[in-house]
Amino acid sequence: IEVLPLDFRKKLKDDGFKVSELIIKERNLANDGTLKLLLSTDDNESIECVGIPTEKRLTACLSSQVGCPMDCKFCATGKEGLKRSLKASEILDQILFIENEMNRKVTNIVFMGMGEPLLNIDDLLLSIRSINNDFQISQRKITVSTVAVPKMISKLSAKSFQILGNCQFTLAISLHASNQKTRETIIPSAKNYEIKNIIEDCKKFVRETGRRVSFEYLMLSGVNDKLEHAYELSNL
């Protein structure tokens, strides 16, 4: 709760009351109504979340970690490295701040903020369970975006059934390249996980969950935007 003094917030916590562990450091409102919040954690780290409004929906873009270990060359967060993973409560607090600041209910969730969600899989799934049960947001309105981590797509499927009882959210793969060589230049971690293996693990995920997998492709001028890349992409 941002308006309460720090000492009073500490006293409330000591007395057993649940008080938000995050405070707002900065607000940035775009002309189209999109709101970016810079939040400070109780250990003085910074994370971001974004509220993206349209007429009929409000999408919350959430962070899952402080920083990120993946070092993707097109992402500013990767330059910071990983500080730590967020607790489920810190993930959920981002939704509350967006709803409070924008004075409307969040309808859709995308885990596309800071961090690699599959490297914080337990708290990710615990937060999804609460988003579904407590915020009354259907899993089908939740998207988990990942650059893909070896063995973690299979683990995501298994853990989803363990923690959620099913797997109804959308998995989105940040592919961003049509061939292995290009992908390794923009996503260093790709050296450990070839595209062909990602595709096979995604096929297994679809078989196990019955849910489709989305693929994200950021076009970078002179890197992955030629016609040959489009042909390669269509043949994956």
Regions found by a protein language model. Give the residues of each.
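Canonical Radical SAM [4Fe-4S] cluster-binding loop centered on the CxxxCxxC motif
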Residues: P53-E90
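Conserved AdoMet/S-adenosylmethionine-binding subsite of the radical SAM
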Residues: E99-N100, R104-N108, G113-L236
